């Protein structure tokens, strides 16, 4: 049905060395009747801050938050908070991964990607983590460091 149509998608290249950059650029910039790129950001660098996945499945659930550091914060202070978050998550049986993406170290804007292998993993994360005292503490700590403006959820597909 039309409700099941994919209207938006994201191409996220994890390993730039394994893909022909010229062909990728031709694909993204091509004029065609199938898709149009609304936003291009080829210079984002991803850093995995939290990984509690044994392996990432070929189909996964992804939440993308668009954020900005506060005036007294930067990647270093945010990394300390994310390390604390990771240590707290060890108390929970949660399958989860988080990536931090930004264009360069001087940029105040960044993306936070939450990865889950299944909707069950995602639901378990929210059910067991979100209402916990640890979660409230981390939410407050992250709120002191940054502000997020939007959050969107996607189904991700690994392409070989």
Language model: regions and residue ranges:
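Short S/T/G/P-rich N-terminal loop/turn motif that feeds into the first structured element of a domain
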Residues: 1-136, 141-160
